[in-house]
């Protein structure tokens, strides 16, 4: 089963948010941008996927393409256990 990777509304939202972030830097250099973006989107991503998977961690892990133990660690990190 091949998954299509489209550049849709999520990519557009991230791009817009980053453009706003760069504008607000006002000449300052950004630092740890990747970590910042991931930390901002990981919680709502986990919440949405767990809701869609009806709190089934195995199903959620498959949807995310990660190991169930990795998912459990991320849920614990965000207080979603």
Show the residue positions of the predicted features:
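Bacterial C-terminal helix-turn-helix
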Residues: 2-11, 16, 23-81
């Amino acid at each position: 089963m091949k998954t299509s990777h489209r550049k849709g509304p999520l990519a557009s939202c991230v791009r817009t948010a980053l453009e706003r972030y760069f504008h607000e830097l006002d000449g300052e250099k950004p630092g740890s941008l990747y970590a910042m973006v991931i930390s901002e989107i990981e919680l709502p991503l986990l919440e949405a996927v767990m809701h869609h998977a009806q709190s089934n961690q195995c199903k959620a892990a498959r949807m995310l393409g990660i190991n169930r133990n990795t998912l459990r660690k991320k849920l614990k990190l965000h207080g979603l256990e």
